[in-house]
Every structure is written in structure tokens, then in C-alpha cells.
Design a protein with these regions (language model features):
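Short, solvent-exposed beta-strand/turn "edge" segments of beta-rich domains on protein surfaces
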Residues: 64-66, 132-133, 160, 265-271
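Charged, low-complexity intrinsically disordered regions
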Residues: 183-380
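A short, structured loop/turn motif at beta-sheet edges
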Residues: 127-139, 174-179, 281-286, 330-331, ...
Length: 380
């Protein structure tokens, strides 16, 4: 129930605070290309497929390409309808689990990602490995395609974002018996220099799922951090999703916000600001709450509360000196689990340079991280 879920909430945010406190940032760059990046190994992959087909009919090139096309088109339909049961039939257990969590997050956020009018312009073999005993056979097919892609609110049909443009993706299949199962999808914009190994390892160690390159699919919209001008330019990487104790869905990711949303330490305007963000789904809506930490820097960009927010004073005077709280409803802010005295005391003692923001039933804890550091501590 609600009370049971809230008991886990403070522990979860303590964990996210601890994670953020151990990290410094990394430079994030985007390599924009389409199918070209996947052509680099295409000739070798095609040769592998043809050679394997001479002794194994499952590798027959035309059949393999046609099957990959069918999965590509079927997945778009099932994804648009949040049909996990159908997707589970042609994906590996690992990948279907990952997709299931993403679908769960979409439902909790009241969203759906509709991809229709799909048109495949080209399909090529991008990678292939023919194992001697068939246990590790794998093949990747890269697609150049077009589609009407829109993220929308389920209740109202309101578009959050939309696109209709050519795109490239690499679809990875692994062999299970006499079947090929979809095991993942790669984007051409993936850049290994943005990889944070400790986040990837944390996902592996805790039964969570990691994606190097991630879009704005599950990004909150509104509040202070994700105003429309920042949301539309956000670049999300190192995305981790999983279930924490108590069944609470948690995400961790790095995010670059553009359009000058921040200042350098010298007080100069900055075109890009890097954040490490922890995000959880709350068991109910708390309206809008913003907990802003004052780091006493004269160069720091002060938070201006969104329209409709009012400043809220807590009973603890020292806390008010370090943190400023804004909320759309003072009573809802007072009932918010993370603003109870024990958590506020812990947050104060840790002295973590991070803010907390609540947008309805989504809570995020975020901290600015340096763009020129390359070292990351391991997850706690």
C-alpha cells in the first residue's frame, strides 16, 4: 500500500544521494551519423552469413533479412501498444525484461510512444558471428527507415514530442535453438567515450538494465530543470533502469542540458551543463516541490521557482539556511516523505551539492557534474 511504499522512499533517495556524492562528470559528445557507421563491418558480416548458410539453413541470407524486417515492423506495432506479451515472444528474456521495465515507466508516467507508418529504406548485415556449436551465434541487421514517431500523453493524446525523419538503428539477434531472438537495439549516436563504467557495473550487479545512448522517452517535463527549452535539447546517456526494494522503479542517468542552463565556476555563461540524475516514481502526486541547495557561490545560478510555486519554510532554521524549498501546495510539501526531519538531517549532514525536484508523481535528485573529469568512483 501507500504507507508501505513510502517507507522505502527515503531509503531509496538516500541511496541516490550517496551515488551522486561519489561521482564527478565526464565530457559528453554526440556522434551524429546514420547508416554509415554500421557499414564499416558490413562486408565481413555479409560474408560470414553466406558462409554459415552453406551448412546451416537458419543462416540463409534472404530468410534472415526478411525475418529481421518482420521483427522490426512488428516491434514498432507492439511497442506503440505497450504489448509486452507479444514482444516477449520474439525477444530474449534479458531484453524483454528491460523493455518491460521501460513500458512500466511509460505507464506510470501516463505516456506512450507511437511509431507508425514505418518504411524500411535499406537493411544490411552489420555484424555476425557463427559459433562452432551454435551456442553463441549472433547477427546484427542495420536498418535505414522512416516513421512517424511521437511521444504523447495517454489521457489527452497531447504530443510531448514528435518526429518524422529518416533514422538508422542496429538490431541485434542471438540464436536460441532454431530461432533468432532480438537481444537489443543500438543507435548510431552511441559514443563509448561517454560510457561511465561504474554505472554499467552497478546495473549488472543489481539486476538492472543499462543503455549507453538514451532518448527523452522517460524524461520528466516541466518544473524547474526540464523547462521546455531545456527538455527539447536534453541529451541522455548511461541510462540505468530497475526495481529497488519495495517495488519502486528507479532510474539513474547522465544528462546534458543546453541553451545556457547554468554557469561555469568563474561565473561565465555555459552552453552545456552536465547533470547526474536519479529518478523515481512516487506512489501518489505531490504537486510541484523544489528543494534547492545554496552552495554560497557568488557565481551560482539562482533557482527561480516556476510560476505557481511559493517559498516554504521548514521548522529547522539551519536547514533553511542551506536549502530553499518551493512548492505549489504547502500541505503537500509537508507530507512529502523526503522532507521529514530524519531525512533532512541526513541530507544536511552529508552536505551533498544536489537538488530535489518533484513533478506530480515523479521525483528527481540531480547534481551538476564536471564536463572535464574522466574518473568515476564505484557505485555504493
Amino acid at each position: 500500500g501507500l504507507v508501505f511504499s513510502l517507507l522505502y522512499l527515503a531509503d531509496l533517495m538516500w541511496f541516490i544521494c550517496a551515488v551522486i556524492s561519489t561521482f564527478v562528470g565526464a565530457a559528453i559528445s554526440v556522434f551524429v551519423d546514420k547508416l554509415k557507421v554500421f557499414r564499416q563491418n558490413s562486408e565481413a558480416a555479409t560474408n560470414t552469413v553466406h558462409q554459415a548458410s552453406s551448412a546451416d539453413s537458419l543462416w540463409q541470407p534472404d530468410n534472415l533479412t526478411n525475418y529481421a524486417r518482420q521483427v522490426f515492423e512488428r516491434f514498432q506495432y507492439d511497442w506503440s501498444n505497450l504489448d509486452y506479451e507479444s514482444i516477449h515472444k520474439y525477444t530474449t528474456q534479458r531484453y524483454s525484461n528491460h523493455i518491460g521495465l521501460v513500458m512500466q515507466a511509460l505507464r506510470q508516467m501516463g505516456r506512450r510512444n507511437v511509431v507508425d507508418n514505418v518504411r524500411i529504406n535499406e537493411a544490411i548485415f552489420a555484424d555476425a558471428h557463427d559459433d562452432a556449436n551454435n551456442q553463441s551465434d549472433r547477427v546484427s541487421v542495420a536498418f535505414l527507415a522512416e516513421a512517424d514517431d511521437r511521444l504523447e500523453e495517454v489521457a489527452t493524446g497531447k504530443k510531448i514530442r514528435s518526429a518524422n525523419e529518416e533514422f538508422a538503428e542496429k538490431w541485434n539477434f542471438v540464436r536460441e535453438g532454431n530461432e533468432w531472438k532480438l537481444d537489443g537495439i543500438n543507435q548510431p549516436t552511441e559514443d563509448v567515450s561517454t560510457l561511465i563504467g561504474s554505472l554499467n557495473k552497478f546495473a549488472e550487479d543489481n539486476g538492472m538494465y543499462f543503455s549507453l545512448d538514451w532518448g527523452r522517452l522517460l524524461l520528466p517535463k516541466g518544473g524547474n530543470l526540464f523547462l521546455p527549452r531545456y527538455f527539447n535539447s536534453a541529451d541522455v546517456n548511461n541510462h540505468v533502469i530497475g526495481v529497488w526494494d519495495g517495488g519502486i522503479l528507479v532510474q539513474l542517468y547522465t544528462c546534458v542540458l543546453k541553451n545556457g542552463n547554468g554557469f561555469t565556476d568563474e561565473g561565465k555563461n555555459k552552453d552545456e551543463v552536465n547533470y547526474l540524475i536519479g529518478q523515481i516514481m512516487l506512489p501518489k502526486s505531490y504537486g510541484g516541490i523544489l528543494v534547492d541547495r545554496d552552495d554560497n557561490s557568488i557565481f551560482r545560478k539562482r533557482v527561480i521557482a516556476p510560476f505557481g510555486y511559493k517559498k516554504v519554510k521548514m521548522e529547522w532554521g539551519d536547514f533553511n539556511k542551506r536549502y530553499t524549498i518551493f512548492a505549489t501546495n504547502e500541505d503537500q510539501a509537508a507530507s512529502f516523505e523526503l522532507l521529514n526531519p530524519s531525512f533532512m538531517a541526513w541530507l544536511y549532514d552529508q552536505d551533498i551539492k544536489a537538488n530535489i525536484e518533484v513533478m506530480d508523481n515523479i521525483a528527481i535528485l540531480y547534481a551538476r557534474v564536471s564536463s572535464d573529469e574522466k574518473r568515476y568512483a564505484e557505485m555504493l
